[in-house]
């Protein structure tokens, strides 16, 4: 911190199918970083996995196709080498903390978190175990079910073990939802009613992951809340928010989330009885701990008409786009966007020390 400001590397882009969502999220993070407090260094992770120095100009992040690469030094405690297109490599100014805004595989699955640990540089956000456990929906379900938490019934599908459509229909009923086990943002998710739907869903799903989940349909409201851990380990759980997909979308799809501006109505806070909301927040805390999460997560639920609460998913790097729920439920709970950033940084520094 030679300048008196904390040097924070913001990673965005990435190799996953959620690359474009990451760019939107990181743009908002860059806007929220206090320039009087932080020296923000945006680093674009290409679809091939290169870390290229970027710039934030007029509210937009540059996405270079080539240029200077940033390489962390193993055990370097924040040291990094810049490899330019031309000329000799040189040592960059010391990095104080890494802030990954990478969604999905190779960013939210423990990979970048492990790299930061190898380099001995602090990292904002969830650590290795929670990231890996939460991103894999199959493993996450097994862990929270073992802890006694309710989830949708599901069948795990691999390339080697593909059940017949009739078997899934018998086990789960119709419709069925097919989803990649290790993707987010509803990428590769399909609503299946017929054998033809099933074959199409399998073909598409396996382009995103080698493991899929077939899940039962639950007629319910979709409710989410945010968890934020302070530097001392205390958890703050936000009010709940509700997602209501437009009638033009049969479920909360990628298009409803990010493409169609009218695809979703978000109600913050959700209109829920106090007892139900308190139970949702308690389950969110329990699931967060069971999966080994720390720092931050968004926890998603189904709430049925008879007030049964079903845990859906946990996202350890939730979306930070204009339409994303995490910052909205935190704001209505009294935590502003810049304060989220400050708390994540403080937590990462405390854990790194």
Swiss-Prot record:
SUPFAM superfamilies: Glutathione synthetase ATP-binding domain-like, PreATP-grasp domain. Pathway: Cell wall biogenesis; peptidoglycan biosynthesis. Its cofactor is Mg(2+); Mn(2+). GO terms for biological process: cell wall organization; peptidoglycan biosynthetic process; regulation of cell shape. It catalyses: 2 D-alanine + ATP = D-alanyl-D-alanine + ADP + phosphate + H(+). It is an enzyme of class 6 (ligase). ATP binds at residues 169-224. The keyword Ribosomal protein does not apply. Mg(2+) 2 binds at residues 313, 315. Binds 2 magnesium or manganese ions per subunit. Residues 141-346 form the ATP-grasp domain. NCBIfam families: D_ala_D_alaTIGR (TIGR01205), PRK01966.1-4 (NF002528). PANTHER family: D-ALANINE--D-ALANINE LIGASE, D-ALANINE--D-ALANINE LIGASE A. Belongs to the D-alanine--D-alanine ligase family. This is D-alanine--D-alanine ligase A. It comes from Brucella suis biovar 1 (strain 1330).
